[in-house]
Amino acid sequence: MSATTDEILEKLQSLTLLEAAELVKQIEETFGVSAAAPVGGMVMAAPGAAAAEEVEEKTEFDVILDEVPADKKIAVLKVVRGITGLGLKEAKEMVESAPKPIKEATGKEDAEAIKKQLEDAGAKASVK
């Protein structure tokens, strides 16, 4: 640190609590700022309001494989392998254990594209 900041720091350390409070008040008035710590403004919001806000700001989506008809399993399996990069065994287990998330925390456009691929292969999918 520079000599100036070292001096200021030493002087601040020597202040009494009353002097520190006066200094804070003067800084607030001089610079037009508030030294009050945020008191959980977002945390204090009502649960219903937080849920509504979350829906508006949602940027990450999960693609859920809801259902796979038996006669479409192989086609869906190929699509799932392509999307996830999983091996045959893991992809097969995923397809057979539907409903199951296929892709999590992806953008809206990607999620819709993946959903369309799955539906084109014969599966029922949803974006959440």
Swiss-Prot record:
Ribosomal protein found in the keyword field: yes
Alphabetical list of SUPFAM superfamilies matching this protein: ClpS-like, Ribosomal protein L7/12, oligomerisation (N-terminal) domain
Domain of life: Bacteria
UniProt KW Ribosomal protein keyword: yes
Record keywords, A-Z: Ribonucleoprotein, Ribosomal protein
Residues in coiled coil: none
CC annotations in GO: cytosolic large ribosomal subunit
Pfam families: Ribosomal_L12 (PF00542), Ribosomal_L12_N (PF16320)
GO molecular function, one term: mRNA binding
Stored CDD domains: Ribosomal_L7_L12 (cd00387)
GO-annotated biological processes: translation
Similarity comment: family membership: Belongs to the bacterial ribosomal protein bL12 family.
Function, as annotated: Forms part of the ribosomal stalk which helps the ribosome interact with GTP-bound translation factors. Is thus essential for accurate translation.
UniProt xrefs under HAMAP family: Ribosomal_bL12
PANTHER family cross-referenced by the UniProt entry: 39S RIBOSOMAL PROTEIN L12 (PTHR45987), LARGE RIBOSOMAL SUBUNIT PROTEIN BL12M (PTHR45987:SF4)
Protein name (record): Large ribosomal subunit protein bL12
Organism: Picosynechococcus sp. (strain ATCC 27264 / PCC 7002 / PR-6) (Agmenellum quadruplicatum)
